[in-house]
Amino acid sequence: MFKLKSIYEERPWLKLYPSGVNANVTFPNKSVGEVFDDTTEKWKNRTAIIFYGNKISFKELREMVDRFATALAALGIRKGDRVALLLLNSPEYIISFYAVVKIGAVVTPISPVYVSSEIKHQLEDSGAESII
């Protein structure tokens, strides 16, 4: 006979949620690039990034991302291409990440603190055609 599973059997982590936390989150049927555009439009005059005391607004961030996405496309990076990001945690990483996803390419994050053999393995395993 068919036995219904409790929500906690299917998703046991929900037992750990404090009461009042919504366990059912809905997401828009949009790409990450579209969500980025919506967010940057909504909060365009607010600060998106503070890095070493320098502030970048959401509007400025979107402009930088769009310029870099255009440059990547001009270099021949296309939808489905894998692009490795070998960058420190910086505004450049954020700009690169969103530029890559906006043109439909796939981000392969690689930590620059890895030793060379780890970086080599990740590059080969991911099939990245380009690296930033």
Where are these regions (language model features)?
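Structured binding elements
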Residues: 104
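Conserved ATP-dependent adenylate/AMP-binding module captured primarily in the ANL superfamily
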Residues: 114-132
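Flexible, non-catalytic linker and terminal segments flanking ANL/adenylate-forming cores
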Residues: 1-30
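Short beta->alpha connector loops at strand-helix junctions that form conserved
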Residues: 110-111
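Anion (oxyanion) recognition and catalysis
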Residues: 101
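Conserved AMP-binding/adenylate-forming core of the ANL superfamily
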Residues: 24-28, 33-37, 45-90, 94-98, ...
